[in-house]
């Protein structure tokens, strides 16, 4: 037990914030707003969607990497990861191993396809590969996902701080929501990227301060580790192959790959950031630079959890009724160990809300891109002017920002209904990853297969998720002690809990219990676990005990299996007719050292070499010829050629021929004689999507 006589478990009272703490919180908001104003003024003459949604498409990889990190390392992560260590074991650290494969897969399998197409919305790919309907279904699913996620990210830290410190709940919700909406709407993607960079710095500063001061309060990090070791919290590995094991090495590494690649590989927010880089190489560099940051936030959170357990090892604040849920432990810990250090709790508040700001701003900008590209332009105003499109994007971002704020208010009233709604959110990312995987990896998949795979996977995952919430299988926790709680102050301590009203307490439990289902693999509520209902084990019970970390992998497998079966039953796409720009050469990427005679059959007939002449000079791909323009040229050129003769000579000055001349690895069907280029076009057209 930490030395001192003014800690919450001894006095029954929780320390409160000072004026300086509120000033530091306000400072974070002001700096974020100023960055938005700066870029609004600086780029006032660049009123186009490329600048607003893609930051002009020439961003440096450093701010992009920081924004990639900040977008989904949210306040829920700051609250949830330490709570995981406090309640369970250190096995969770294995999720960091999966990050290596996540970044590799995202940077070298998925992102090159999106970058090659120069998309603004990731779901444009689904229309090109399948159909407009699949694109719309994917885009709307993503928007619902992000709206729910943004609301929880905004509400969770506000509620946790309010419950522990009395920090004004709706004051923080409204101020953070409005400032975030303001600078995102005003400054666009550049403002989002640079505010994310500032906010990730605040997150690291806050986490480091909490760890240093927390370790000091228990006699150092080694002493904290020893205390945790006494109760088995320092177990480093669980090699159980049982998929019901909540956190095994297999689940955290293999399941974690699918959970996180759904974020870094195909999520609109991350794809948009990657496409804002000046080149594919810069986008890949940004991805890899982001990796140490992922590890830093993860392991800082893990170590804070160990010190937090060491501090409360003889008096669990939840059972002592100081707080009502695990997501309130970190703010309580901050107030206990740093409440007397003037202004430092405010640094933690800045850290917490920086995570919220970065996530919400990224979400608003990505939703604006999807609504503009996938709904408004796709169905209503295809030929909208750039100025008007930019203004519409700003309006959409602002409108959804207000919706996000409003949804947090509704969240405080819905209670159990909200729990069911938010549980659905966690099962969406896997099916979306599945439909992109189906399109990029399996050339035989067709539109019917994409529809069936996406819908079937969503239904199956909803079934598992809802069943899990009903059954609530018990999950054992590491031991917690109450031997040194000051029970004479039980009444006083209980009165502290009254800082949270009834509805807030209910939603706090909802937030915690829903955290497991989110993409950043955050954590389950202690309250939900302890209240697990006793039910009769039916034949499907094992399905409902599936570890949440396997959800994305299960969803991807379901999507691909259903999608391929339906595709073959309804007339598969011929691999030889597949446009290679829409595919990812998986085996070439994973096994580049294999000889050509082995790799050739593993390409399943897709002619990836056909695209090389468009990629040999990246300047052409990025700036001079958009892929849709290439397709349009094919359609026009082939119509004219086929009406006359396949031996008609192609114009040596045409843009396609100029691109062909840049290919240093000439394919057999392309010769240096322009007279034979028509046949090249005939053959090349067969590799487009029919």
Label every PLM stretch briefly.
Residues 1-690:
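Membrane-embedded helix-loop-helix hairpins and adjacent transmembrane boundary segments
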